[in-house]
Swiss-Prot record:
Function: Binds directly to 23S rRNA. The L1 stalk is quite mobile in the ribosome, and is involved in E site tRNA release. Protein L1 is also a translational repressor protein, it controls the translation of the L11 operon by binding to its mRNA.
Gene3D superfamilies: 3.30.190.20, 3.40.50.790
PROSITE patterns: RIBOSOMAL_L1
Keywords: Repressor, Ribonucleoprotein, Ribosomal protein, RNA-binding, rRNA-binding, Translation regulation, tRNA-binding
Name of the protein in its database record: Large ribosomal subunit protein uL1
Superkingdom field: Bacteria
PANTHER family per UniProt: 54S RIBOSOMAL PROTEIN L1, MITOCHONDRIAL, LARGE RIBOSOMAL SUBUNIT PROTEIN UL1M
Gene: rplA
Organism the protein comes from: Bacillus pumilus (strain SAFR-032)
Amino acid sequence: MAKKGKKYVEAAKLIERTKAYDVAEAVSLTKKANTAKFDATVEVAFRLGVDPRKNDQQIRGAVVLPNGTGKTQRVLVFAKGEKAKEAEAAGADYVGDSDYITKIQQGWFEFDVIVATPDMMGEVGKIGRVLGPKGLMPNPKTGTVTFEVEKAINEIKAGKVEYRVDKAGNIHAPIGKVSFEDEKLVENFATIYDTILKAKPAAAKGVYVKNVSVTSTMGPGVKVDPSSFSAK
C-alpha cells in the first residue's frame, strides 16, 4: 500500500473515519481537506447493492448537473452533411467522419467526449477497441449516439456527466471543483444522487445504496449520511 504524504495525513485528521456526515458538512470538509495546489475536482462515490455481472443489474446513463462540473469539455462529433453543419453551429470542437477515425488510429486523443449520429456508428465501430477501454465509445444510453446533435452538444457543454457501475458495484462521478460554492456542490450532489436512485434495477435486492462518500482529487474521502439529503 502506498504511503500517504504528510499533507494528506494532516488533512485526514479533520475527518472522523467512522462518522457519516450531513451532506453540507461533508462538502465543506472535503474542500478543507483538499491538499492539491490546483482547482481539484470534487467527486461522489456510491457503493451499490447490485451484481454488475448480471445484465439486468447494469447501471449506465448521464445527467446534466445544474451547476456544471467546472471543466470545459472538448467535443468530437462524427456526422455528415447537414448534421455536421449543425454540430459546427452548436459549438463542437471537432467535426468530421473518416478523417478523425484515421487520426484516432494514429494516437490522437485531444477530446473528452464523442457524439456520433447513428449512421456513423459503423465507422466509429472500427475504433471501438481503442475507444472502449478509455470510456470514450459513444452510447445511446448516455445520449451520445443521436441525430439530435445540437441538443447533445449543448448538454455536454452545460455540464453533463456520464456514470456507469464498475465491476465492484461502484459508481464515481464528478460534481464540481473545490472552488465551487458549497451550495452549488450540494445541488449537484443531490441531482446525481436522485438520478442514481431512479436508476435502481428492478432485479436489485436488499440495500441499494450501501455507502456514499465525497472526495477531492488528492484528498481523503468523507462519508455521507443518506438521510441528510434523501428528502431534498
